[in-house]
């Protein structure tokens, strides 16, 4: 029985490689949506939904994005994930650089839009409310502040705790992404496993440093919040180290196919 025209078109479409520009556009859009949804929930609705609501916003956003743009770019939306994929040979250096640039652009655009929305609320005070930036010490969410919120009475979690949690939790995220998207696993519910992992990560680490595990997310909003800019290097360097660790653990434990499912 000869194939229908639709089947022929679908088969040819599957064989054609996706242009790099389309992958980069998908990564920019995906990172924009992730930052806008997750950080936007924290900034605009955080007091109403609490840490659980913020964690679900990040997790569900990533879950949906895996299915929306995963077939196009793999849905990294995170330089640490891109680094892990690069180390396993799943993409070239040039492609990885394009991914990271696209992710940063998408994140920065989300930060601009989010700040434009937040500052229209008369009671919004950037010095007090910030924009969902990551931080440690006096900028940790666990820091104790005075009645007006501007004076820190006691510091929150310190630098060492922040480093440990960012490395370990980013490694966990990258490991789950790699294990859920390889040819041997071929898990139809990859989006669910990845999204739930990100939600759990946020539940663990929001009280510590507001959860990064994603340099693009941290850089997107750091410079809108007083004191967050000088600390943002922590949330770039150590999630990337975590990405390397996650890729190494994946390779050592499984030694599986280095190819991602199509």
Annotate each PLM feature.
Residues 1-262:
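Membrane-interface helix-loop junctions and terminal tails of multi-pass membrane proteins
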């Amino acid at each position: 029985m000869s194939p229908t025209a639709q089947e022929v078109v679908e088969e040819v479409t599957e064989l054609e490689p996706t242009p790099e520009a389309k992958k980069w556009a998908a990564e920019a859009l995906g990172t924009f949506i992730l930052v806008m949804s997750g950080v936007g929930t924290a900034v605009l609705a955080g007091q109403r939904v609490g840490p659980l609501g913020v964690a679900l916003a990040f997790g569900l956003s990533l879950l949906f994005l895996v299915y929306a743009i995963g077939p196009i770019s793999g849905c990294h939306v995170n330089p640490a994930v891109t680094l892990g994929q690069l180390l396993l040979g799943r993409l070239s250096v040039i492609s990885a650089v394009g991914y990271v640039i696209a992710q940063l652009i998408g994140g920065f655009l989300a930060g601009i839009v989010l700040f434009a929305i937040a500052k229209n609320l008369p009671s919004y005070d950037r010095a007090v409310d910030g924009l969902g930036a990551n931080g440690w010490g006096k900028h940790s969410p666990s820091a104790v502040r005075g009645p007006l919120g501007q004076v820190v009475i006691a510091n929150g979690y310190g630098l060492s705790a922040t480093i440990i949690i960012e490395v370990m939790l980013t490694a966990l995220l990258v490991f789950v992404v790699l294990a859920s998207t390889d040819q041997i696993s071929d898990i139809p519910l990859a989006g669910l496993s990845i999204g739930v992992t990100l939600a759990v990560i946020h539940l663990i680490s929001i009280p510590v440093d507001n959860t990064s595990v994603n340099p693009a997310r941290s850089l997107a909003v750091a410079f809108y919040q007083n004191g967050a800019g000088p600390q943002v290097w922590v949330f770039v360097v150590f999630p990337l180290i975590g990405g390397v660790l996650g890729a190494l653990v994946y390779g050592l434990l499984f030694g599986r196919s280095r190819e991602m499912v199509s």
